[in-house]
Amino acid sequence: MSATAVHSLWTTASGVTSAAPGNSFTAPKIEYTQLMPVLIIVVAAVLGILVEAFVPRRARYHTQLFLTVVAVAGSFAAIVGLAAGGYGTTDAGIVAMGAIAIDGPTLFLQGTILLVAMVALFTFAERRLDPGSNGNRVDSFAAQAGSVPGGEGEKAAVRAGFTTTEVFPLLLFSVAGLLVFPAANDLLTLFIALEVFSLPLYLLCAVARRKRLMSQEAAVKYFLLGAFSSAFLLFGIALLYGYAGSLSYADIANVVDGSVLEIDPALADTMGNDALLLIGGAMILTGLLFKVGAVPFHMWTPDVYQGAPTPVTGFMAAATKVAAFGALLRLLYVALPGLAWDLRPVMWAVAIVTMLGGAIVAITQTDIKRLLAYSSIAHAGFILAGVIAASPEGISSVLFYLLAYSFVTVGAFAVVTLVRDAGGEATHLSKWAGLGRRSPLVAAVFAVFLLAFAGIPLTSGFSGKFAVFKAAAEGGAGALVVVGVLSSAVAAFFYIRVIVLMFFSEPKADGPTVAVPSPLTMTTIAVGVAVTLVLGLAPQYFLDLASQAGVFVR
């Protein structure tokens, strides 16, 4: 091509550009104030990576712990500031060019996630439970995550007292994704947030100090099944985009309602196709139900909960359920409210088999972590009853249940870390026989958590179940409530069985010991017990708070 031709093309292009100023690039509008809780966590996570690169190894633990505590506390303070400024009620809105919603459910769920992250963080930082080599204090994580289990590299790292302090920035990255997940206002943001919190969790599951092969197996299972569910979610997103011509929740809802104002010419043949809507919605629902651990998408839960480091299990069991149910609520109430009656039979079936399946299979478990895993599956079914209510009361009841369940879960897994034998944590139920005689306080605390799981009055579990069952009954799901009550009765059997085992069985001579933790784990357990009792004895303030927060912005 000649120089004259090139000049002509350049001149023509310049003329077109100058003649069409409306096509000029517009800088994105980012509301940094409303996004401050997430930004604080992301900045701290990046700083945590720099700490790993430049801070001497012996100083990393305290530096990372301080940085993580400050970041989580600062982010929670930002949440409180936004709530006080009315961003959860009167000033709620859509920010980041439509990608994120800042409203009552967002702030309530983000606050819950941050509180869970703080108490779980203390179990991450615990260094007094496992006897270290040469007097070194070690935590629950592998001395050198990249070494071969049982190899010379691992042995040398253990002798040197190394710890995997990378778990702190990984935790922060996961928290960042969890904060965005329930706030996502379009499908692309939803998928990105899912991957941001999932990838660090895959790594955290693989770095247990004891039983490393089981830990790595759990991580591989979680990764493979998680990738499979992400594929379902992504394919569903593609189908919904073909249906609506947009990834925005509001635009999708408009097309579902038949109030769309503009049709994308490139998607004229697919927009409004009900088959794309139903299949795409079902596939996205599948991806989210995998994250909450609902049947039949629950198969990863017992193996991962059992194999992962127990502090990671506690955090994952609580925080991911909070974020995933928040995302599920927003999808159903904001993007797909027009599909409520179409999805209702499916949601009913999933809730019923989840409640019954989790409760019945838990009876057969002999490992305390697997028992708690199936317990979490049953609780996912109870929470789905509130989701199915399809009412403001249903939303607020789910928010309250998630708050109550989270602290009970983290506290219960914190207690599990204390009961130990020569191989680490003693998770087989037979080893918990007579624990009430050997360590009455620890057994009593664990009994409180088990009674809360069972929904016994005066605990947070009773208040939460009463709220979701009441909302479901008022929403026309009375039969579902009956199934839920029956499932709760079945579940109460195996919870009480553990209590009987601890207090009314003879302790074995070679039974486990109860480690004396640092104030960090003591704080986690104490906070869990306090929240469990407060939400059980005086829940009204928190029920009102959840009710005020239970309004989605569109």
From Swiss-Prot:
Enzyme class label: translocase
Gene Ontology terms, MF aspect: NADH dehydrogenase (ubiquinone) activity; NADH:ubiquinone reductase (non-electrogenic) activity; quinone binding
Catalytic activity: a quinone + NADH + 5 H(+)(in) = a quinol + NAD(+) + 4 H(+)(out)
Annotated compartments: Cell membrane
GO cellular component terms, semicolon-separated: plasma membrane
Transmembrane helix listed as a keyword: yes
Keyword Cell division: no
Keywords noted in UniProt: Cell membrane, Membrane, NAD, Quinone, Translocase, Transmembrane, Transmembrane helix, Transport
Role, per record: NDH-1 shuttles electrons from NADH, via FMN and iron-sulfur (Fe-S) centers, to quinones in the respiratory chain. The immediate electron acceptor for the enzyme in this species is believed to be a menaquinone. Couples the redox reaction to proton translocation (for every two electrons transferred, four hydrogen ions are translocated across the cytoplasmic membrane), and thus conserves the redox energy in a proton gradient.
Similarity comment: family membership: Belongs to the complex I subunit 2 family.
Oligomeric form and interacting partners: NDH-1 is composed of 14 different subunits. Subunits NuoA, H, J, K, L, M, N constitute the membrane sector of the complex.
Protein name as annotated: NADH-quinone oxidoreductase subunit N 3
Recorded name of the encoding gene: nuoN3
